[in-house]
Amino acid sequence: MKNAWIIISFLVIYTSTTAQTLPLKQEISLRAPSNIKLDGKSTEWGDKFQAFDKATEVFYTISNNDENLYFTIKVKQPRVIEKIMNAGITITVNNTGKKDDEATDNVSLTFPLMDYSNVPRIVTASGAKTKRIMVSAGRGTRPTDYEPEFNSTPSDSLKDVATKLLKANAKTIKIKGIKEIPDGDLSVYNQENIIVGAAFDHTGVYIYELAIPLKYLRGIVNQTRFTYNIKLQSRLNVLRPGMVTSYNYVGGERVSADLDLDSTTDFWGEYTLASKQ
């Protein structure tokens, strides 16, 4: 048992140290690897990232080639993964350098978004369930504990189940601000060459990749410094049937037990396209 605690302590310290050695924002421009593949894996990067944002608890790397801008995101914390499965990650790019959620020239893309009935299944199978998940069958019905239809003991095979469930149910990307594409839901199997890749690895870590063709980003060219925003949406922004907020009573007052899921967290950064060497 003593050895087990030593191993666990080492893993916690290693993870914390890794995050602490990274900058809060990416500081350099990067050419995307020639073998980049949006499959929900970070193997082409050697699982190394350029920054770690403490507010969102997101590791990330931004890169580009002559055709696309790429975002590669890694999330380790189970509760943060649950938040993402509930409401998605929104990535916003502004080619004029604004850091304003309401800027009219923002381009934003949100993924994943899916029917809520699939979220508890994915969260449980991935190992991201940290406490009871309440679900509702509809208005006027009493919320009940989610009971998985499978043995939820963590295992490599269940992580595969989580990835398969995610791919089977997260079928659209929410688009806003691209002149050539109407605002709204775009199929992940689109002809506009906007590509997403997402998966859970064998430890339950979530990897999300996004490719945006530069032609949709309105004039971003080499040496142009632009701004980006990575946002973990609040569940309250995407309310769907079946969602339930749990409450605790503190000093006689009702307090949400899911403030982390019901709060938006985000950060802004700046990036310049990397030129071909």
In which residue ranges do the predicted regions lie?
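Short helix-loop boundary/capping segments
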Residues: 165-207
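Surface-exposed, glycine/proline- and aromatic-rich loop segments on solvent-exposed faces
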Residues: 49-166, 232-240
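Acidic, glycine-anchored loop motifs typical of Ca2+
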Residues: 37-44
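Short, well-ordered beta-strand segments enriched in hydrophobic/aromatic residues
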Residues: 40, 68-75, 206-214
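Bacterial Sec-dependent N-terminal signal peptides
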Residues: 1-26
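Beta-strand-rich interaction surfaces with strong enrichment in secreted/lumenal proteins
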Residues: 49-50, 58-61, 194-200, 258-260
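Long, compositionally biased interface segments
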Residues: 221-277
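Sec-dependent signal peptide cleavage junction
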Residues: 18-33, 269-277
